[in-house]
Amino acid sequence: MEKEGADYLIIQSNMMTSAMVAKDLAALKLSTKMICLNWAIDEMWVDLVKEAGEGVYGCIPYALWSDENLPGVRVMHQVSNKYHRNIRTRPCHYVQGFVAAMLLEEALKRVPTKPTGKQIREAFETFRNVDTGGLLPPVTYTATSHEPCNSLRIYQVKKGKLVPVTNYITVSR
């Protein structure tokens, strides 16, 4: 990669693949900077790759399990502890799934008792800056956009921890 002048390697894969790549970059002592997109990095990944993860960047659109200062993360911890005690961390997929369930619950509050699929979709489309307690930036759905999030923060692995290096960066729709 260095021979070809690659300064950055951007990876969107699963965490096992990105972990292998990070370890190989470190073993080969390459200076190419690694950027992992949302499914390729989280706190469990950092524990897996150890020192090989130092300096790696991650683009993450939702809160981390360790963001205990956020109300949504505290609720997520309470729910997790109710059913699975002694879990010290959860992967990004858990956070993303929790947010999806939270948003579905909010949509179901806005429909009749036995809703149709169309009514549920229309309920989602009423969302304007729905607060997830910091799990995501405020969520808006419209008839033309069903994207719950168009923002992310960039993190960097520093001393074995994912540390935010930006605030949320938002792309206009």
Where do the PLM segments sit?
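Extracytosolic ligand-binding ectodomains
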Residues: 1-173
